[in-house]
Each structure stands twice: as structure tokens, then as C-alpha cells.
Amino acid sequence: MNTILAQQIAKEGGVEAWMIAQQHKSLLRFLTCGSVDDGKSTLIGRLLHDTRQIYEDQLSSLHNDSKRHGTQGEKLDLALLVDGLQAEREQGITIDVAYRYFSTEKRKFIIADTPGHEQYTRNMATGASTCDLAILLIDARKGVLDQTRRHSFISTLLGIKHLVVAINKMDLVDYREETFARIREDYLTFAERLPGDLDIRFVPLSALEGDNVAAQSANMRWYSGPTLLEVLETVDIQRVVDRQPMRFPVQYVNRPNLDFRGYVGTLASGSIKVGERIKVLPSGVESSVSRIVTFDGDREEAYAGEAITLVLNDEIDISRGDLLLAANEALAPAQYAAIDVVWMAEQPLTPGQSYDVKLAGKKTRARVETIRYQIDINNLTQRDVESLPLNGIGLVEMAFDEPLALDIYQQNPVTGGLIFIDRLSNITVGAGMVREPVERGVTPPMEYSAFELELNALVRRHFPHWNARDLLGDKHGAA
């Protein structure tokens, strides 16, 4: 057993008491990102090593791996704790998003180590989508690079408000204060163009030597701020979903017997109480909450992030993908939206293409109307393009096959975030963040292939009880 873990269990008075204490610790999800070889994996390895989260067999294996794959000579190559794929170890880079877990006496942590190479930007965006804080590593010898700007922009685009700029490899510049000050000034100048109200902090460190990671550095006495670990343990994460109106996307309908009908899901934002009046979108039907059922029994109130089952006082038609919200909310379903897109497929995104989209349990179809612009995230400028390439980021207007209840992503990532799915391969090809619903006039009918129209006609003729919608709509009447 890990020595520090054994000490913590003994201090709490046994395994059960220790597990209860762990449940009540706050959780911080953060990612490390930056340019290639800035030391992201080494930093995570240093955090795990200095907080004594490594077991004896792992340490022994690390010694052996450092001799075979290491890049630090006779020293331990702490990056190998994270770079688990064989290709990563052979090339000395990170390719996939690697997740690691550790805890201190003050907090629990989930780390996402993301790749630095530009061709793996989609992997980095995936890692950032669930994080509260981003550590942006900068090589003290190189300063702010294009990839640093790229990752900073993607992090803020995905709603991360807390940025820790870790200026790494200070040992290679003789721990000079002027180097730290120059890079800090350069980054702040760039950050003025980043969207949102950001909390930006700077820490000079050496992941390889351990300076200012978990303990204060004797080599940088000019720096009086907190260590990186102290920042992570004390940063106040204000979740935006706690302050937003109630949203409850229905994951599925639970009907184990004739006497029970509950709607299961995770409360995306806000809170809900027994007796509260609710409205169902897109139907607009209203009811009230009679029970809030959880794994631990019935509750009088539930909060954002909790998995619950809602029982209503009325028997109304609710299915997977519907959205429950407060009855007095004025949210109207939208059929058009402007969406920030991170494109993840080799085949570029072009106007006129149709995809399946999935948003908070709701799956429907959408068409690309126009690409307003692509963002050059090296200098945050906008340029007109005819298509959005792999790893491209741009603002796109989409038309949905049916009206959807949408929130702005920066206010509610669950009901404002969606994925694009290729209808033939079923592969996720893009991620979208709703910028704003778009007002349009009469909705034009979606264009369908001859095969889809024929299949729709066959289904309606031979399976009328399925209640399939006529894809041609009013065109029959017009004809």
C-alpha cells in the first residue's frame, strides 16, 4: 500500500472513515496543455511523485522504464508515469488524453494530460470540455508560442475561466526573474483578446527539479507567491451551472411497474424542489414535482450535478431528450443557432452537409447553413472560408430538423453543448458550443435523399402505429 495513503487511513481511524472523508472533499478537474515538449507529462508525474501518490511497484517500474525509454539521463523520467501508449514512449510525446487521479488533505483532483501537437487539437478539446481549470505550460527558453495561444483560446472557448500559466524549465534559464517577468507580460498582452472574465495566475517552476511544484523553491527567492499545488488546493471554483435556472434533460423513462413512472437524468443546472411547477419542452405541457427519488432515498430538494428520478403529479407525455425547466421560464425552442465548432474529421465541414446531432440526450438532425468565419487561433483573427478543415475552429450557422431547447454554452454546457455524428459511420466528427439562437422566418423543409423519402413512405404505409412523420410535410397538399 502507498505509505501516505496508509498514514491517511490510520489518521481517519480506518478505511470506512477515510472513504467518508474522501466523499466530502471538493473535486477539481484540471488539464495541462501547452506546446510540444513544454513538460506537461513531467509536471503531472512530479505532482504525483511529490504528493506521494505513487505505489512502490510503480516506482520500481518507473526506474526500469526510465532506463529504456527515459529522456533525462540517470534521473527518473516522470513523464513516463503518464505517457502510457507505446507510440508515446517511443516518440517521447503525448498523443491521447491521459487521465490521472490523486488527492491531498484538502482536495481531490482529476488531471487530463492533453497532447501539444497541433494535429491532436481535437484530443485537447475533448480533455478541456470537462475541466474547471487549465494549466498552460510555457518553456522559459521559448516564451509564448502559437500552440500556447491555441490552447488558451480553446480552453476559454470551452468555458474554462481559471488559467494557471506555469512557466516551466526555469532551471534552464538560471531561475532569472527577468525571464519570468517578460513572459508574464507577453502572455497578459495576448490574453486581453481572450473572451470572458478570466482568473489568470502565474507560477515559475521546474517540473524536472520540483521547484515551486509542491514545495517552495530555494532557487527563486524573488518569487513570493504560492506553489502550483497551493494554487490547485485553494482556487475557488464557482460553477456557472449553480447560478443558472433549473434544467433537467430526461435520459430515460423508468417504469418498472404499473404504479411507478419516473423520469431519470442528471440535473444540469440550478435546483428543484418537491411541489415545484415545471414545464416540458418542446411540448410546453406543465405539471408539478411529487417526488425526487435518489439512490439514498427520497429528497425534498436536488441540486446541479446530482443524478435523480423525478415523479410528477400528472400523467403527461415525456420521452428521452425532453427538457424539464421551471414553469415560469421563457425559454423557447429554436430551429436555428450560431454554433462555435471544433471540427474533428478528415473530411472538412462544408455548407449544405447534414449530420446527426446529440444534445443532452436529444438526438436529431441538422444541416450546415453557412460558415460565418474560421478563427485563426494563433492571432485570434477571423477569415472567410468555404469549409472548416480538421482541427479548424469557426462560427457556423445550423438548421435543426426540429426546434430544440438551447442555452448559451458559456451559461450551461450541458444544454448548450452538442456533438456532430456522421450518419453513415456513426463517428463523432465535431463538437459544438451554442453561441446564440438565430431568429429566422418560416422554416424551409430539410432536403432528403430519394432513398430516405422512399423508406419514410414505406414505414408510414406498413407501420402506421409508429407514428412516423411525413418528411415531405405540406408538399403533398401543394402538389
UniProtKB/Swiss-Prot annotation:
Residues 168-171 are annotated as: G4. GTP binds at residues 34-41, 113-117, 168-171. Signal peptide: none annotated. One of its GO terms (biological process) is hydrogen sulfide biosynthetic process. Its EC number is 2.7.7.4. InterPro entries: CysN_GTP-bd (IPR041757), CysN_II (IPR044138), CysN_NoDQ_III (IPR044139), G_TR_CS (IPR031157), GTP-eEF1A_C (IPR054696), P-loop_NTPase (IPR027417), Small_GTP-bd (IPR005225), SO4_adenylTrfase_lsu (IPR011779). The keyword Nucleotidyltransferase applies. Residues 25-239 form the tr-type G domain. Pathway: Sulfur metabolism; hydrogen sulfide biosynthesis; sulfite from sulfate: step 1/3. It comes from the Bacteria. Residues 113-116 are annotated as: G3. Residues 34-41 are annotated as: G1. It catalyses: sulfate + ATP + H(+) = adenosine 5'-phosphosulfate + diphosphate. Disulfide bonds: none annotated. NCBIfam families: CysN, PRK05124.1, small_GTP. Belongs to the TRAFAC class translation factor GTPase superfamily. Classic translation factor GTPase family. CysN/NodQ subfamily. Heterodimer composed of CysD, the smaller subunit, and CysN. This is Sulfate adenylyltransferase subunit 1.
